[in-house]
Each structure stands twice: as C-alpha cells, then as structure tokens.
Design a protein with these regions (language model features):
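C-terminal active-site "lid" helix and adjoining low-complexity regulatory extension at the edge
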Residues: 2-5, 9-11, 16, 305-311
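N-terminal basic/disordered segments at the start of proteins
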Residues: 25-48
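Conserved N-proximal alpha/beta basic substrate-recognition cap immediately N-terminal to
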Residues: 51-153, 161
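ATP-grasp fold ATP-binding core
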Residues: 132, 150-168, 185-195
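Conserved ATP-binding module of the ATP-grasp superfamily
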Residues: 138-140, 168-199, 214, 224-227, ...
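Short beta-strand scaffold segments in enzyme catalytic cores
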Residues: 199-202, 289-291
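ATP-dependent carboxylate/phosphate-activation module, predominantly the ATP-grasp catalytic core
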Residues: 202-274, 304-311
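Conserved metal-phosphate-binding beta-hairpin within the catalytic cores
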Residues: 270-310
Length: 311
C-alpha cells in the first residue's frame, strides 16, 4: 500500500490535535462531503481517506483539511495504527459497510461515532427483520425459497451496494429461470410493494433523549426510473430487465398527515434498539427505508443504522 498526506489548511499542529482539536475522519466516498462539511461547520478538523480515483475531488474542497490516499478502500485497516496515535473520531457511512468486515469494525480502537453493537443487527437481514418487527413496523412478506414465491418479488443482495445486483422477479417460474445469476451470493426474496419510495432520515441524541426527522429523499435508480418514459406497448419485445443501481437522490417533502407515523416508527426503532443492543442502543443518524402504498401505509424495506447518501 502506498500513501500520501496533504494538508488543506495550515493551522498550528492540526494533524496532532494540539490544543484539544479533534479531527473528524471518514472514507472519501458515499456521504463524506456531508459529514466533513458538517464537521467543519461545528469547528472540527477534517480528514478524508480517499483512493487514487477520488483524491483529487476531496482535495478540491476547502472544508477538507487533509487527504490520505490509499490504493483501495479495503486498505483502510492498515492505517489504523497511525490513526490511533491521533485525536481522530471516525464517522462511518455505507462504504465502511461495503469495504470493511464486521470484525474490522469491532477491532478498531479509534473513537467511532455510533454503537458497534448495532452492526450485527443491521448486517444480518434476519436479525434486522426481528428488530423491525418488534418495533411494530409493517414489513413486506419474505420468502425462504423460490418455490414459495406467489407474487412479484425483488431479489436483494446483502450489503451496502447501492442497489447493484437487485433483480425483479414475477413469480416462482421466473425466479427458477434466473437463479443461476445468483450463484454463490447471499440474498433475500422480498415481496415487491407497489408505492412511493420514501427514505426517512432521523437523528437520535442520547444526550437530550430527543429524536429528530432531519430530511427525506427519493433515490434515482437506473434503469428502473427511466422505464416509465417508455409506453408499455413499446416495451413489449424490447427484452429490458429493470435494474436498481442508485445514481442520485432527490429531496422529498412528506405529506404532513404522514409525519406522525413516520415519527412513531423512528421512536420505536430506537426504543427496541435499547432493548436488544444495551442501554446506548441506536444513536446518531439513521434511515428507515420505506414504500408508501396508495392507502398511505408505510412498508419498511430495511434500516440503515448510519448516515445515508441522501441525508
């Protein structure tokens, strides 16, 4: 692994945190710009750990004080001994989930914003479903085998991959014809709920005991969000498979009459987390990913126990 270090601002001893200054650090990916801009606004030093394709981007922002370049994000753990000698606080996001293992997260001794006990419940689709069920959230039906499928489903791969590899399946026969595409991959078979996607961004502070809804968004996915521009009659014979790769996020203002239920869901998710993960439970930023049906019911697809890209 090769590494370079660049200082964006020449403040006295910023890198060593002299004078009590902490540095907020994160991988240069996913939602790093939101995290580092917010950290700078709150008076912290900032550090982006980028790869060779992204280092130029992060060096171009004035609120990024320092950039460390590594060959690939999975090399992050080799930096840990150096970072442990500094006044660093890691703020994780989806790329930490994608590129580091659970064991990597747990053995890190750098101060880490978030409760690592939550990671097991987020990473396991089965445990996550137990958590959300105990919080009295409506969940789409889940199928254990392809033979059980009796309605349209979406096949979801494990991990934070921005929808990559997701697959729409009409019925059991359709699944069997395409199952070879899923060889040696972990996935779930989830009922496809028709409605409006709404990703609700929360922040829970254990210091004040208060929960906030900060924002909401919709995700733009290629190519599924462009298929509606093609008349259904024209789609016949085109042999187009919908894909769900996220390419961007758009702000969403939720109808006010739905806010009470959105808030209730967040409160109950936090409450149950304190039962299953210890008194600290889930804190900081998190996102409940929902579909809102025509009868204005929320169906929860999953939870991200951290900041998400649209926050």
């Amino acid at each position: 692994m090769t590494m370079t270090i660049e200082h964006g601002l020449q403040l006295q001893d910023r890198r060593d945190g002299v004078g009590g200054l902490y540095t907020i650090a994160t991988l240069g990916s996913h939602s790093a710009l939101q995290i580092l801009k917010g950290a700078r606004d709150e008076g912290f030093n900032t550090l982006a750990i980028a790869n060779r394709e992204t280092e130029r981007l992060y060096r171009s922002y004035a609120f990024v004080d320092e950039v460390i370049t590594i060959d690939k994000y999975s090399d992050f753990m080799s930096l840990v001994p150096e970072l442990e000698q500094r006044k660093i606080i890691i703020v994780p996001h989806g790329s930490f989930v994608a590129y580091l293992s659970l064991e990597d997260h747990k053995k890190m001794r750098i101060p880490y914003f978030g409760n690592k006990a939550v990671l097991d419940w987020e990473a396991s689709r089965e445990l996550q479903r137990q958590w959300l069920t105990r919080a009295n959230l409506k969940l789409p039906r889940q199928f254990r085998t392809g033979a059980e499928i009796d309605r349209p489903v979406i096949v979801k791969l494990y991990g934070a991959q921005g929808g990559k590899g997701y697959m729409f399946v009409r019925d059991a026969h359709d699944f069997e014809e395409r199952a070879s595409l899923l060889a040696r991959q972990n996935y779930i078979l989830q009922e496809y709920v028709i409605g409006v996607p709404a990703y609700i961004h929360y922040f829970y502070s254990p210091l004040t005991g208060k929960l906030e809804i900060m924002s909401m968004d919709r995700r733009y996915e290629t190519n599924v969000d462009s298929l509606g521009r093609i008349p259904s009659s024209a789609q016949a014979g085109m042999d187009i498979d919908p894909s769900y790769v996220v390419v961007g996020n758009s702000p969403l203002v939720l109808r006010e009459s739905l806010l009470a239920e959105a808030f209730r869901m967040g409160e109950d998710v936090v409450r149950v987390s304190q039962e299953i993960c210890g008194p600290k439970g889930l804190f900081g930023a998190f996102c409940i990913e929902t579909i809102i049906t025509p009868d204005t019911n929320f169906y929860v697809m999953e939870i991200s126990a951290r900041i998400v890209a649209g926050t």
